[in-house]
C-alpha cells in the first residue's frame, strides 16, 4: 500500500511539473498516465484528474485574484455556463463507453497540441478594438489591465457574449467528461469569440477552473467514481509539482 501511495504521489508530482511547464494544468497528463501505464479504469482516472485540477486551481486562486489581468465580472458570468456544462458532462461520463472517452481524449490532445503551436508562433496579444454588445454593455463586462511588457494600460471591450457562452458550455462539458481544466476552450471563447486580449483571457480562464472543477467533483463523488486512495496522493503530488514547475 505504501509503495502504491508513493508511486501515485510521484505521478502527481510529474503531472504537476509538466502541466506547469506547458501551461496545460496537471489534469491533461494524469488521465493518460493512469490508464495507459497503470491500467486504471478511465472513469476513475477522470475522477482523480478532476480533483487534481481542483487542487491546483484552489492553490492558485489567491494569486489569480491579485492579478489585475483577471476580469472577475466576466469570470462570474461565464461560470454560469461552464458549471451547467460540467453537470451535463459529468452525467454523460456515466453512460459514455470507455472507448469513446479514449477517442475524445485523443482528439483533445491533438487540439491542445495545435493550440500550443499557435501560441508559440503568435506572440502578439489581441488588443481588441471591438465594441461591447448589448449584454456586455448592460453587465459592464469590459475591462483594463496594465501590461508590464508593453509598459502601458490595455483597455478592452467584449463582443459576441452569446457565442462565448455557448463555447463556455462546451468547455464545461469537456472538463467534466475528460477530467481536465479545458483552459484551451475557455481561452478560445474569450480571446477568439469575445475578442478579449489573450493575457486577460488566460488569467480569467485559470481562475475559472476551480469553480468548474468543483461542480464536476461533486457529481463524480456522488456516483462513486472518486477513489480516495487513488485521488489523495495524486492531488497532493500535483499541488507540489505545480509549485516546482
Feature annotation, model-predicted:
Residues 51-59, 81-85, 92, 208-215:
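Membrane-embedded alpha-helical segments of transport systems
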Residues 49-53, 205-209, 230-235:
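Short hydrophobic/aromatic, small-residue-rich stretches within specific transmembrane helices
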Residues 12-23, 60, 168-179:
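Transmembrane alpha-helix interface/packing and boundary motifs in multi-pass membrane proteins
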Residues 25-80:
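Juxtamembrane transmembrane-helix termini in multi-pass membrane transport proteins
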Residues 60-69, 174-176, 186-191, 211-226:
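Generic transmembrane alpha-helix signature in multi-pass membrane proteins
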Residues 30-44, 185-200:
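Interfacial segments of multi-pass membrane proteins
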Residues 22-30, 179-187:
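Transmembrane helix boundary and interhelical junction motifs in multipass membrane proteins
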Residues 1-15, 36, 66-172, 192, ...:
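Juxtamembrane transmembrane-helix boundary motif
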Amino acid at each position: 500500500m505504501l509503495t502504491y501511495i508513493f508511486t501515485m504521489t510521484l505521478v502527481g508530482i510529474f503531472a504537476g511539473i509538466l502541466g506547469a511547464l506547458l501551461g496545460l494544468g496537471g489534469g491533461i497528463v494524469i488521465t493518460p498516465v493512469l490508464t495507459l501505464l497503470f491500467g486504471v479504469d478511465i472513469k476513475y482516472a477522470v475522477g482523480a484528474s478532476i480533483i487534481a485540477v481542483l487542487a491546483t486551481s484552489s492553490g492558485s486562486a489567491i494569486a489569480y485574484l491579485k492579478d489585475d489581468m483577471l476580469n472577475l465580472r466576466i469570470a462570474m458570468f461565464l461560470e454560469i455556463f461552464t458549471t451547467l456544462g460540467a453537470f451535463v458532462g459529468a452525467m454523460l461520463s456515466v453512460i459514455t463507453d470507455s472507448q469513446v472517452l479514449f477517442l475524445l481524449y485523443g482528439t483533445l490532445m491533438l487540439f491542445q497540441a495545435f493550440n500550443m503551436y499557435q501560441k508559440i508562433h503568435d506572440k502578439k496579444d489581441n488588443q481588441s478594438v471591438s465594441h461591447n454588445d448589448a449584454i456586455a454593455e448592460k453587465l459592464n463586462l469590459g475591462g483594463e489591465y496594465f501590461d508590464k511588457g508593453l509598459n502601458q494600460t490595455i483597455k478592452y471591450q467584449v463582443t459576441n457574449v452569446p457565442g462565448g457562452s455557448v463555447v463556455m458550455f462546451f468547455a464545461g462539458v469537456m472538463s467534466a467528461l475528460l477530467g481536465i481544466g479545458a483552459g484551451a476552450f475557455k481561452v478560445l471563447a474569450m480571446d477568439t469569440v469575445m475578442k478579449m486580449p489573450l493575457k486577460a483571457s488566460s488569467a480569467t480562464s485559470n481562475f475559472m477552473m476551480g469553480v468548474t472543477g468543483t461542480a464536476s467533483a461533486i457529481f463524480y463523488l456522488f456516483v462513486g467514481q472518486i477513489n480516495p486512495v487513488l485521488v489523495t496522493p495524486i492531488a497532493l503530488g500535483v499541488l507540489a509539482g505545480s509549485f516546482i514547475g
